[in-house]
Each structure stands twice: as structure tokens, then as C-alpha cells.
Amino acid sequence: MECGDGPVPYRFSSPLHRGVLRSRYKRFLADVELENGQQIIAHCPNTGPMSGVCQVGAPVYLSHHPEPKRKLAYTWEMIQVDGVWVGINTSLPNRLVDWGLERGWFPQLAGFSRRQREVTCGKSKIDFLLTGDAGSAYLEVKNTTWAVGSRALFPDTVTTRGQKHLEDLIQIRQQGQRALLLYWINRADCTEFAPGEERDPRYARLFREALQAGVEMLPYRVEVSPTGIRPLGLAKIVV
């Protein structure tokens, strides 16, 4: 993938392949029928329940990686739900945040010229340690695909790891350091964000505690398309 100029600031470096989702199983696998009728097994880079987005018969796009060492040549990247493309590759948001930090995607993170990935904090790892003229800040990133109406929600299942990250960020903030949590809303049809209390009540409670402690929440919207990804700015937080 590479940078692109124009309306989509981030473009896929090679064309994606269109198909139709036939099934998803064993969390990591998906049966897809390509446009030419070929039936293939694709890697599903999302181990969560994919609430509301794993719809059999829906159009999908796959990236193709024909390297001999790979067991599966195709990776499922996005699915179309109610006319909206939703990014499902959970490995992409962290890479795009890293990429976007260099290109001014996040005005809230201006003043940080250096970043370190996967920083140990207590017994956990935080995605980024940012440093620069603005000081230092710890930043955790969460991929968000579940939506009810125009509201994005996270998580869509109980996440003890996510709970621990919130506890760590609260502790970081209590120590006087800046702490941020960026929810990567991987679809363009959401204008609001809320914690997924229905699926993980404890996470929702910790989310509110983190807000009160001064942890900065950035529910960041993007528009996903078969050619690339465009930043849309922040959604409104609803608690």
C-alpha cells in the first residue's frame, strides 16, 4: 500500500479483487466466490464476532498475495453492508494510524514527531508512545466495525484485554502523563460513538471512568472504498 494524492489520501498499492462472501468459519477462514466464478478460501484477519457485518451473500474485496510461503493467497479486506463498505482487517488500523501521523490526519496529535510501537506499560503493551515538541503521550488503537444506526459501538464482545488497556490508560493519566484511545471507525455511515455496554458492561463502566480521569477518547471516522481510505474526522461521543 502506498500514499496517493487526491480525494483518497491512502490508496491500496495494487487492485483488490471483488467477490461474494459464502461463509466464514474457524474465525480465520472465509469462503468467497470471485467475480470469475472461482471459489477460494481467504484469510479472515478478524477474530471477533464481526457483529452486523458478517453477512453471507454480501460483496467483499480481497487483497491478493501470491507469495509461495503463504498458505492462503487472498486476504479479506472489506465487506459491503447496506451500501457502505466496512473495513474488517484488524491489522490495518495501526498501520494507518502510523501512516496518518506523518501526514497530519490527526490534528489532536499535532506536535508529536516521533513514535515508538508496542510500548510495555505495566503488564500490558500500548500501541504507541508519541514524543515531540508537545511532550509525550501514550496512544492505544481499537478497530471498530459494529454499528447500530448511525452509532458506532465498541466492543461487540467481552474484551478483558480492552478492559486492561483502559485501566492502564487511567493509571498513565493519574501519573500526570497524556493518554489517548483512538477508536478507528472503519465505516463512513457513523456520526456517533458509544461504548458497547450491551456486550461488555464492565468495559463501558471503565470507559466512563477513563473519560472522567482525563483519558482522551478519539472516535475517528474513515471512509473505506475498494481503492483506498479517506479520513472523515471525529464522531460525537455519546455516554
From Swiss-Prot:
Pfam name, any one: SfsA
GO terms (molecular function) for this protein are: DNA binding
Source domain of life: Bacteria
Q: Which InterPro entries match?
A: SfsA, SfsA_C, SfsA_N
Regarding protein family, the annotation reads: Belongs to the SfsA family.
Query: NCBIfam families, from UniProt?
Result: sfsA
Report what the protein is called.
Sugar fermentation stimulation protein homolog
Q: Which species expresses this protein natively?
A: Synechococcus sp. (strain JA-2-3B'a(2-13))
Q: From which lineage does this chain's organism come?
A: Bacteria, Bacillati, Cyanobacteriota, Cyanophyceae, Synechococcales
